[in-house]
């Protein structure tokens, strides 16, 4: 449900619904969801950009388009301010299970293509998870990038000679996540694929997900997405245009090596056999502590750290501990040395306030 926005002061959105998640038994008085009005103002003031063909994400044209794209409504979990949310009672133990002394890091992994509203749709053969996939056809462009393209390949001497078509067809290995992401801003649709691969007879993938960017609707309970938690990926990555602007106004995603056999809103799926309550669930939300001093970091890293204080980051998949997702855009500077100064102990796990009702 799209709601009216109040832009004169901090945007407040009152939502009603029946998805109470872990709030059962708590005080159910109404909680007012908060979102940043500057985000809405930025989107509304952006000059509309014509999209006449597929636009690679790592271009100035894509930067201009993304400035005016609203990835889900203002009251969506990705766009909700959580600075005042309470700390989870088991926060310390969950932090320790991941590694309190381990550094924050990132994978320069995710890539996407922006397509026009009339992009030709093609079939994608879904193999591993057809019962938890959305049906096609899909507007997959010929130049859709596969996870890691281009930066992860161009910065590796052993992979530098590979072309996009090589990567689309499975080089250097099919044994990888190979996420493929397609954004259709005009129709407000997001298409995400797990292990997307081009073959002589068309495209294949192990899973396909379609998200309505005008809606807060989740995937069906128990369903995966191209991410293990059942969440979308594109709203969660750090992009070049955001680093250049100096503001990231959404939550981020990260991975942990060991997660629990459970999920919490807004996740819909788990990917573990472990039941230890000290392990984080898929969808667990972490926030950088308010007292963490960001003043000595570069402008780009400050924008990431401020976002982690204001919006936090969700456990979205299994992988390297404390690893966020940054776009595989070779315009993004190397940030590893700075981010490694942030440790697991600088975070806290948060939980939704009493009376919070997930938006529909």
Indicate where each model-derived feature is located.
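Short, surface-exposed polybasic-aromatic patches that bind anionic ligands, especially phosphate groups
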Residues: 26-360
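Signal peptide processing junction and immediate N-terminal pro/mature segment
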Residues: 18-26
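Bacterial N-terminal signal peptides
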Residues: 7-18
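Positively charged n-region of N-terminal signal peptides that target proteins for export
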Residues: 1-4
